[in-house]
Amino acid sequence: MSFQCGIVGLPNVGKSTLFNALTESGIPAENYPFCTIEPHIGIVELPDVRLKDLARIYSPEKVTPATVEFIDIAGLVKGASKGEGLGNQFLGQIRQTSAILHVVRCFDDKNITHVDGSIDPVRDVETIETELLLADIMTLEKRKQKVEKLARSGDKEAKDSLYILDLLLEHCSDGKAARLLTIDEDYNEFKRSLHLLTEKPVLYIANTSEAETMEDDTGEHVRSLEEYALKENNIVISLCSSIEQEIALLKEEEKPIFLQEYGLSEPGLNKVIRTSFELLGLQNFFTCGEKEVKSWTISKGSTAPQAAGNIHSDFERGFIKADTFHYSELIKNGSEKALKELGLIRQEGKDYIVKDGDCIFFKFNV
């Protein structure tokens, strides 16, 4: 399973710098709007100490981490929903993503222009949210026109769809994101099928100054963003994208010293990647052996056969059982042999719900 996180925000807020840090690439990060026209795509490893621990125990020929795909989407501006600043193209790119990382400028720098002339994180967030909402309203109105004809003919499914469309239109017209509308479980599949921009989960990235990072002090700009995010139960991660880019370009042995200088326990990007994972309700299980130790990504709540299907469809189709133990038990006891002697390797069936950190050996027959 793979998923994409779209990095969005106004022009000149640090999106491309953040992307460079995430992917350790060197795309332009110039001080003018629309520096990024075509979206830049990067695949990033999920930071996971468990994989290193498993590799130490199994000494495999190959270690394969889980990955996250990030897309650097050009800066949105007011009027994007009407096509301003190549808005239609950029909104279409956001529609293809699984989650949104919204980069918000929370630093003052006279050398870097702001499209609105001043620093106001809440105003900036609302500018983007408004454009996404307007685009969603247009999507809903177009869909409603198509469904109304069928509903008038007595089609029950169309009537149900029309009911949900009206609920969403009223909700979005009130300036509320589609993800905040709770509806009956029976209608969630239809809601998801609309691919609304404001249905996507959002993580706010407060891009702060180097001074704020060194002082470990939350400034007024970050505090205002946190208060705004709290209203929607959203998360804010504070980091300085320019520092993160410097860290990303260092050799591994140099990173701890640099982090210590800034009083950081780890790169802020590690938290961004992990939180993006959690935002989408994803988790990992592992397959372990002498040839390969690999991390696999599944949705929380997945059954053992569904997890097996991520490896190969035959594994799901011919699933028999799953020999399972948890990563923590392996670390505690030191070896798979010790787990067997203690009776800690379980045989799970088709109804087993896979837990984050499970190590699984699937048995199947096709």
Language-model regions, residue ranges each:
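Switch/coupling subdomain of P-loop NTPase systems
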Residues: 95, 99-102, 107-135, 139-142, ...
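Alpha-helical initiation/capping and key positions within long helical/coiled-coil segments
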Residues: 36, 89, 132, 139, ...
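C-terminal-of-GTPase-core extension/linker across diverse P-loop GTPases
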Residues: 2-8, 13, 19, 146-353, ...
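Short, intrinsically disordered, mixed-charge
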Residues: 24, 56, 92, 130, ...
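Conserved nucleotide-binding/hydrolysis micro-motifs of P-loop NTPases
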Residues: 24-25, 50-51, 75-77, 105-111, ...
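Flexible beta-alpha connector loops of hexameric P-loop NTPases
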Residues: 76-82, 117, 123-132, 151-157, ...
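Conserved G1/Walker A P-loop phosphate-binding module
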Residues: 1-113, 122, 141-142, 147
